[in-house]
Amino acid sequence: MIDEATPLLRVRGLTKRFQGRRGLEGHLAVDGVDFEIARGETLGLVGESGSGKSTTALCVLRLLEPTAGSVEFMGRDLTKLSSRELRGDRRHIQMVFQDPYASLDPRMNVGEAVAEPLRIHRIGTRSERRRQVAELLDLVGLRAGSAERYPHEFSGGQRQRIAIARAIALNPQLIVCDEPVTALDVSIQAQILNLLKDLQDRLGLSYLFIAHDLGVIRAVSDRVAVMQRGRIVETGRADEVLARPAHPYTRALLTAVPVPNVLEMRRRRSVWKEMRTLRASET
């Protein structure tokens, strides 16, 4: 039995080196990363493109094999599990990708896509899976009739809702969100972020939330870890780190506003204003 005080996920010394060609040294993408995620918590992992965020996530899931380090999830070190053992643990840890269209098989209708994890793990009869798909679609704000349609018939935001429905189908404990709103329109970003927060409250989910947009990280994270060149250079409560950054790289991220500055600031204000409005309308 796992103590509730034990972190859901504990990563220690996680390292990933990609081998170079013809005996060359290769690239150290993740360099001794440590972090923890508590039950029901969101850890925001932020950094520039190429900082190692997504590689870290893939190593946590063992979609990439770590070079060194440990990934303890629910008290078990995933790096030491066999493929068969890992398959069972993957029921409890899922991923939502940046591009919802690429993550959905265009040959499957929505019902088949959402039910696929249930079918793979042999959960329920066909009729039971259909009922569960309808419940999952309702949970993410889509009509049950959506199950018969195909991914290309939906907008980007709706496709991300479908991907989220599939991610929660197995009642996971942890969801890794890799830039889940980056490809979406501004108004839709706020809706998806609110959906993720609502699901967290309802289902007790934990998130490892990866983003390069500090505004997004500020809105969704309990704690934040700042990543630079494969290392975590600063970590702490999101409000404290983003209000009083200690590391020069974190300060640089906070002061770096893409051109054109005015348009970018307006865009960010629009997203967070809409998020506050949506949350207020639900209470």
Predicted regions and their residues:
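ABC transporter nucleotide-binding domains
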Residues: 1-256, 268-283
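Proline-centered turn/helix-capping motifs that create local helix->coil transitions or kinks
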Residues: 260-265
